[in-house]
Structures are given as structure tokens and as C-alpha cells.
Amino acid sequence: MIRSVVRGFGAALPKRVMTNKEIESRVDTSDEWIVQRTGIRQRYIAGEGETSASLGEAAARAALERAGLTPDDVDLIIVATSTPDNTFPATAVNIQNRLGMRHGAAFDMQAVCSGFVYAVATADAYIRGGLSKRALVIGAETFSRLLDWTDRTTCVLFGDGAGAIVLEAQEAAGTKADRGVLTAQLRSDGAHRDKLYVDGGPSTTGTVGHLRMEGREVFKHAVGMITDVIEAAFEATGTTADDIDWLVPHQANRRIIDGSAKKLGIPLEKVVVTVDLHGNTSAASIPLALDAAASDGRIKKGDLVMLEAMGGGFTWGSVLLRW
């Protein structure tokens, strides 16, 4: 059978770092409060000329270089983003053009913070279905441009950045020992759409709008939803928490990350955490964390890696893959 195997990975961050101390000068908050409630110490903020497409392009080029490939070797680009450069065309098409590609297919996916998990699942389906041989899967966000910088409940949480992986079709035995994507579990429930949303859009207000969130409601549902899709992945593959080498969660909040790991029985030393450095970068958070952990040698070839995320909608999902 065909598996979608990770060939390369890469990341890109804006030049500017914004610390909690700087946010203290903007709104009524403190470094101590932010760290205690979220685990965030800093975040990167896009500056002039830095966009979701430019960051996504840089991450894509890094992933291709790591894989020893060129844009000519890729036939599919999927970009997970809630902050596109334009309403249309897709940011993926923009990145395709920046890479000099004149072939293949490119499109965006919008599942907010779950976007990268949804995009990996979609690329895997294309590869297993024979519609793609190599796919660039990118998470790219500039959430700082959706923030109300007078709202202390949200402006402290988010940052900008991009990460990417290259998935390649490879023959496999069809067992849980295979390298590549082993299963994907996706969920959504639109009844919660008003708990985390942006109060604008082309067909309603004609404006971009600002991010709005009921933080307590999100926190209340997060751990249960996350563990649901992880347990479903275990069931689908005949694996358990003991088999996991690394849990790479969406980097939203340190308390959610720790709570999910504890409920699943996964030791914290097996959890990749970058929320302290990046803040919540939405669809970019998982590929940024993958890049960090694979670059420093923590994630190694053959490791069993669980990706999980929950985002606005609500959407949530998991991907279990062998590196």
C-alpha cells in the first residue's frame, strides 16, 4: 500500500519578537499573569512586507531544501491559514507562484487552529488516492493582524509564523510499523462557532474584523475533544499511549497541553512544547513545533508521533504518523 511519508520540514518566523513586558505597556496585564495562565513568554509579530504568503514560502523552501527537492518535484500545495494575503486567490496559489511552479494544484484550507491537521489529512488522502506524489503542506498565519490590541484577553495569546512539511508517496507493508501517516481523525461541531470567531468577513461586514473568544468555554471543551480524537487514532491503529514517542500538540495554552497529556497518560517529557516562544500561531503551531523538535534531534526517523489540534468552529483532529 501507499503511505504519505515526511521527507522534509521547515519553518519561518517574523523578525520582530514581542515579549510579555512589551504587552504590559499596551494593556492592563503582567508577564507573571500571562505566563501563569498560558505559559507564553514571547511571540513573533509580522512586520512590513511579512505576510502569510512570504512566511509560508520561506518555510516551504526550507522544507524542500531539507528534503533535497525542488519545487519541480512537488505536485500539490495545501496551505492551512485563517489569515490569507487576499480573500482570493488562495495563499497557496500565491506561494506556488513565489516558488516558480507552473504545474500541479494549490489550494487553501481553513479550519483555524486545526488547519494543519486537516491539511495533512487531506494531502494524505490525495497521495493514497493517486492524485499526488509529493505534497507541500504548509501552516502559515499572521494572526497579529486580526487582534484587537486593546483586548487583553486575546492580544496576549497569538503570534505569527509558518511551518511546512513535504509528504511523499512511498510503498509500505500496511502495518503500524510503516513510516508515514497511519491514520487521521477529524471532527467539527458548528454549535460552538460563536465561542471563538472573527467578527467580520466579506459577505457580512465587508471588513476583516477582530478575533473574539470565550476563553473559559474553549478551555472547558479542549481537553475532552483532544483526547477523543487521540483515542480514536489509537483504536484505528492498534496502538496505545505507551507506544507514542512524541506528542506534538497545537500550541494554544500550556495548561491545555499539560491537561491533555495527563489525561492520556503521556509523560510530559514526551510532549513538544513551543508555546512559550511562539504563542498561539494557529495553523502554524504544529509545523513550527515539528521543525523545532526534528531540528534539534528529539524527533528521529522511526519515531511514532501524534499531532493534535482544536480550533474555532469548533474543529478538532489528530494525525498519527511514523517519522
UniProtKB/Swiss-Prot annotation:
CDD domains: KAS_III (cd00830). Homodimer. Keywords: Acyltransferase, Cytoplasm, Fatty acid biosynthesis, Fatty acid metabolism, Lipid biosynthesis, Lipid metabolism, Multifunctional enzyme, Transferase. InterPro entries: ACP_syn_III_C, ACP_syn_III_N, FabH, Thiolase-like. The keyword ATP-binding does not apply. It comes from the Bacteria. Its main location: cytoplasm. It holds the Pfam family ACP_syn_III_C. GO terms for cellular component: cytoplasm. The last Arg residue of the ACP-binding site is essential for the weak association between ACP/AcpP and FabH. This is Beta-ketoacyl-[acyl-carrier-protein] synthase III. It catalyses: malonyl-[ACP] + acetyl-CoA + H(+) = 3-oxobutanoyl-[ACP] + CO2 + CoA. One of its GO terms (biological process) is fatty acid biosynthetic process. It is an enzyme of class 2 (transferase). Its EC number is 2.3.1.180. The active site is at residues 113, 250, 280. GO terms for molecular function: 3-oxoacyl-[acyl-carrier-protein] synthase activity; beta-ketoacyl-acyl-carrier-protein synthase III activity. It is found in: Cytoplasm.
